């Protein structure tokens, strides 16, 4: 029997050949999809230890500059914890589904992110319809006519959001406040009891966080307002700026494609063409738990964060010239 002549998908795919099916791309990454429960616990415990140590330092240190520095680094660590929760929400943190839900909720607490609401907005909408205008709501581009139809305040905000200087403001207002923190029916038509419970959970954590900082300030004879600024507001705003920047650069690059036609969007292989791999010096990508190796994540969401670097390298080896770096 004569073998069928099919493209060799075990070798790099030239640009003049069709992109293989997503199933094939995922098969390349199967060796990198193994998840470790013990590693998940170590990552979560380590980052929480960093978070609590830095928040404590914002109260215990005397110099304002030192408080500010610790507050900003605490915000960065909130981002690291969020990436762990992000993995849990994708079921890529451990092999255990229910454990992932618990660990994800724990990891999301410092970012005040309700787990189930984020799961719906991110897993169902963003990953299900990445860069499909009218469905995916993250950094959706506007036509000139759509921009002109905005109110003066909305125009001002859009200019600020897209200036490159205020991605944190965008995330805080458009994503966290409108869609993740007791969203109204306009932004979240689906209503589930778990949405309310998860929102209440992060409120309780936030209240306890504020109360602990205020009590520590009183106990040490410091300004309560300064302590809250350095120990709560600065970390939270830094975190929003960090995640806002991450999403901004992932989905607004000039080479990233957006579509308003579902058929064209499907044909464009959106899991490859709608995001970028942003590289940094000094191992900053590793310090961010490799969330910037984003193409690999969109191709296969089951890849754990500690294997994304290898997965991204494999895709770039097999798909030369197709991945935006």
Show where each model-derived region lies:
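Membrane-embedded catalytic scaffold of the fatty acid hydroxylase/desaturase
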Residues: 78-85, 89-199, 255-325
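Juxtamembrane/interface segments at transmembrane-helix termini
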Residues: 245-257
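Cytosolic juxtamembrane amphipathic/interface segments immediately preceding
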Residues: 26-35, 188-189
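Alpha-helical bilayer-embedded segments of polytopic membrane proteins, i.e.
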Residues: 34-81, 111-113, 158-173, 191-246
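Short, motif-level signal for alpha-helix interfacial/capping segments enriched in acidic residues
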Residues: 24-26, 59-72, 129, 228-231, ...
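Polar-ligand-bearing catalytic/cofactor-coordination segments
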Residues: 2-5, 9-13, 28-30, 254-258, ...
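Short, charged cytosolic
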Residues: 2-25, 164-180
């Amino acid at each position: 029997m004569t073998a069928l002549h099919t493209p060799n998908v075990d070798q790099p795919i030239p640009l003049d050949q069709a992109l293989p099916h997503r199933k094939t791309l995922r098969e390349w990454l199967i060796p990198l999809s193994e998840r470790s429960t013990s590693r998940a616990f170590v990552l979560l415990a380590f980052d929480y230890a960093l978070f609590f140590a830095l928040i404590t330092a914002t109260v215990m240190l005397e110099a304002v500059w030192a408080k500010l520095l610790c507050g900003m680094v605490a915000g960065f660590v909130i981002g690291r914890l969020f990436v762990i929760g992000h993995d849990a929400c994708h079921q890529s943190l451990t092999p255990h589904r229910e454990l992932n839900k618990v660990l994800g909720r724990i990891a999301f607490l410092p970012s005040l992110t309700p787990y189930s609401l984020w799961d719906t907005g991110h897993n169902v909408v963003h990953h299900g319809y990445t860069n499909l205008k009218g469905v995916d709501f993250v950094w959706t581009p506007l036509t000139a006519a759509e921009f002109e139809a905005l109110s003066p305040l909305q125009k001002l905000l859009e200019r600020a959001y897209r200036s490159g200087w205020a991605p944190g403001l965008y995330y805080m207002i458009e994503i966290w406040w409108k869609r993740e923190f007791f969203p109204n029916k306009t932004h979240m038509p689906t209503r589930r009891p778990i949405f309310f419970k998860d929102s209440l959970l992060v409120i309780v954590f936030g209240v306890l966080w504020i109360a602990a900082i205020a009590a520590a300030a009183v106990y040490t004879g410091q300004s309560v307002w300064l302590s809250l600024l350095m120990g709560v507001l600065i970390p939270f705003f830094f975190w929003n700026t960090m995640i806002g920047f991450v999403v901004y650069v992932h989905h607004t690059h000039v080479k990233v494609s957006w579509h308003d036609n579902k058929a064209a969007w499907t044909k464009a292989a959106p899991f490859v063409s709608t995001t970028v791999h942003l590289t940094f010096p000094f191992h900053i990508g590793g310090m961010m738990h490799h969330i910037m190796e984003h193409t690999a994540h969109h191709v296969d969401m089951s890849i754990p964060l500690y294997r994304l670097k290898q997965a991204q390298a494999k895709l770039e080896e097999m798909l030369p010239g197709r991945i935006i770096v």
